[in-house]
Regions:
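Short loop/turn motifs that initiate or flank beta-strands
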Residues: 1-223
Length: 223
């Protein structure tokens, strides 16, 4: 039809062409990946690395024209699959703040891969638990003159096993230091009790809560 004030009709005109074009694009359909998992927790190691299990996979394909453009499924007949090595990364390296692991390292491959983009599965819930720290009292030649009590005035020094790479030492506090007996004949050791971690030294920014002591009291030979 023709619009105007001349009462024109379609037959009064002839088109210059029976087809015309306009610029347009087709955007990629997003495919959903699933199948990866991580352990519910792991011990502190000073990094955000998480060990990934499972196999990344796409949803089952569907016939072109069916489903929706947002259903995450490839179309039957298209050659597209997942390639790469899945990497898991904690949101934080430290015990107090680590709550989730995100996945990365995957992409699409195949003749029709360019028609799609990949949506990696949602982060997994996971935590980091304290690493076990074992202190050993390194004082030698611990002794005192008999004073009728079990008190000891030593300042404990320690060596440690269980520090993660990059951490070099820990500062410990205690609530008591005492001989096992007060008498010369029976006194054989000093016990440092009520041990707790005050701070960690190293280049990992580790804090006391990233470690748990293997025991809250330690002994050293003494006379």
């Amino acid at each position: 039809s023709i619009t105007g004030n001349k009462s024109s009709v379609a037959g009064d005109y002839a088109l210059s062409a029976t087809s015309k074009t306009v610029a347009a694009t087709i955007t990629q359909k997003s495919l959903t990946e699933s199948g990866l998992s991580v352990a519910a927790s792991r011990a502190y190691d000073g990094t955000t690395a998480a060990s990934v299990s499972g196999t990344a996979a796409l949803l089952a394909s569907e016939t072109a024209g069916s489903g929706t453009t947002s259903d995450g499924k490839p179309y039957t007949g298209d050659t597209v699959s997942i390639t790469g090595t899945a990497v898991g990364t904690y949101n934080d390296a430290h015990v107090a703040n680590a709550t989730t692991v995100t996945f990365s390292g995957l992409s699409l491959t195949g003749a029709q891969a360019g028609n799609y983009s990949l949506t990696i599965q949602s982060p997994a819930s996971a935590t980091i638990t304290a690493a076990t720290l074992t202190p050993t009292i390194t004082n030698t030649g611990v002794t005192k003159v008999y004073d009728g009590t079990t008190s000891s005035s030593i300042t404990p020094t320690y060596s440690f096993t269980g520090l993660v790479s990059g951490d070099t030492a820990a500062t410990l506090t205690n609530t008591g230091i005492a001989y096992n007996y007060k008498d010369v004949a029976t006194a054989t050791l000093v016990t440092v009790s009520g041990l707790s971690i005050s701070s960690i030294t190293g280049n990992k920014s580790s804090v006391a809560g990233d470690y748990a002591l293997s025991a809250t009291s330690k002994t050293v030979a003494a006379t």
